[in-house]
């Protein structure tokens, strides 16, 4: 194959692989991601404020494979697939102060948690 068609083919393959992905999804792993949060003091919104907090977003490694013979025997041949996975989770938190604007031009404050660091860790149904 001549050189020019090979280069064109590689460029087209590169476009096909990366099209439709945002920069964040193109980077493997688990990363901090900012999002806007609105805090209200009560259901009526007597005091409220907003803050950019951090979440953990991304993907981590997982795998599934046929179980070993010893696992099959021990499970009565019911556990024929063994899987292992990790989930993107918050590894540490920090408190941040949110300033609230209240009715009557009063001001208040409230502390909320935001992610400080993220990591791939054992998947859990619920941590809280």
From Swiss-Prot:
It comes from the Eukaryota. Its main location: secreted. Disulfide bonds join 30-88, 47-102, 56-118, 60-120. GO terms for molecular function: hormone activity; protein heterodimerization activity; thyrotropin-releasing hormone receptor binding. GO terms for biological process: adenylate cyclase-activating G protein-coupled receptor signaling pathway; cell surface receptor signaling pathway; regulation of signal transduction. Glycans are attached at residues 36, 80. Residues 1-20 form the signal peptide. It is found in: Secreted. PROSITE patterns: CTCK_1 (PS01185), CTCK_2 (PS01225), GLYCO_HORMONE_ALPHA_3 (PS50277). Keywords: Disulfide bond, Glycoprotein, Hormone, Secreted, Signal. Functions as a heterodimeric glycoprotein hormone with GPHB5 able to bind and activate the thyroid-stimulating hormone receptor (TSHR), leading to increased cAMP production. Plays a central role in controlling thyroid cell metabolism. Heterodimer with GPHB5; this heterodimer interacts with thyroid-stimulating hormone receptor (TSHR), and hence stimulates cAMP production. Belongs to the glycoprotein hormones subunit alpha family. This is Glycoprotein hormone alpha-2. The gene is Gpha2.
């Amino acid at each position: 194959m001549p050189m020019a068609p090979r280069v064109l083919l590689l460029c087209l393959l590169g476009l096909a692989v990366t099209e439709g992905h945002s920069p964040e999804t193109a980077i493997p792993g688990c990363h901090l991601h900012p999002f806007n949060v609105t805090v209200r003091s009560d259901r009526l919104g007597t005091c409220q404020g907003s803050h950019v907090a951090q979440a953990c977003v991304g993907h981590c490694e997982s795998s599934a494979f046929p179980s070993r013979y010893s696992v099959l025997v021990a499970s009565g041949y019911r556990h024929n697939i063994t899987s292992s996975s990790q989930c993107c989770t918050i590894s540490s938190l920090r408190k941040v102060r949110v300033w609230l604007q209240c009715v009557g031009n009063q001001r208040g404050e409230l502390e909320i948690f935001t992610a400080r660091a993220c990591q791939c860790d054992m998947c859990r149904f619920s941590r809280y």
